[in-house]
Amino acid sequence: MKDTPKHQGLRNQLVTVLQQKGITNKNILEAISKIPRHLFLNSSFEDYAYQDLAFPIGAGQTISQPYTVAFQTELLEVKKGDKVLEIGTGSGYQTAVLCMVGAVVYSVERQNELFKKTSLLLPKLGIRAKHLSFGDGYKGLPNYAPFDSIIVTAGAPEIPKALMAQLKIGGKLVIPVGENSQIMTLIIRKDETQFEKHEFGDFKFVPLLEDKN
């Protein structure tokens, strides 16, 4: 599959939709206008790639809808050079958005099939994550901690303590929390022991599975 002017036109329309839904961060909108989302999907979904929808990507996983990607990224308030941990690399689309807004991205994926596929795809598209790894997202990446931000792209029944421990003071963790539908939750680390919690509307995510490797 190629990236054509038609795809660019569809991306521009998607950016307009996201703006109408309340996304305002210019860097995020620019990233979404540039990243060829259709290349992260099975070719059978190509015609729908720039609709604001989630799609299956294999291994029981989905690529989140663009609004969710933009919303989570906006909550992190990523600055250029921020060290960001992503739990659930999946298709690599969220990874690409983070890289494009200037983050130094460390990403973990627990499905080997997706890990291999995405590890090959991102470099082909000129997207350079700092570190991609195969493993249990619940544990984070303690060897590379602390992080300015942590983004979790799968629903979790509760907030993993290991991830909270890997945040810098002042760092932000964005995670969908809940069993059936999830509440988008923002955790800000105030000091060694204090964390501030903010909750945003309901979202639907595949579950974050523990110890599945």
UniProtKB/Swiss-Prot annotation:
Listed GO MF terms: protein-L-isoaspartate (D-aspartate) O-methyltransferase activity
EC id: 2.1.1.77
Compartments where found: Cytoplasm
Residues annotated as signal peptide: none
Active-site residue numbers: S64
InterPro entries: PCMT, SAM-dependent_MTases_sf
Keywords associated with the record: Cytoplasm, Methyltransferase, S-adenosyl-L-methionine, Transferase
Annotated catalysed reactions: [protein]-L-isoaspartate + S-adenosyl-L-methionine = [protein]-L-isoaspartate alpha-methyl ester + S-adenosyl-L-homocysteine
Top-level taxon in the UniProt lineage: Bacteria
GO biological process assignments: methylation; protein modification process; protein repair
Principal location class: cytoplasm
NCBIfam families: pimt, PRK00312.1
Function: Catalyzes the methyl esterification of L-isoaspartyl residues in peptides and proteins that result from spontaneous decomposition of normal L-aspartyl and L-asparaginyl residues. It plays a role in the repair and/or degradation of damaged proteins.
HAMAP family for the chain: PIMT
Protein family (similarity comment): Belongs to the methyltransferase superfamily. L-isoaspartyl/D-aspartyl protein methyltransferase family.
Protein name per Swiss-Prot or TrEMBL: Protein-L-isoaspartate O-methyltransferase
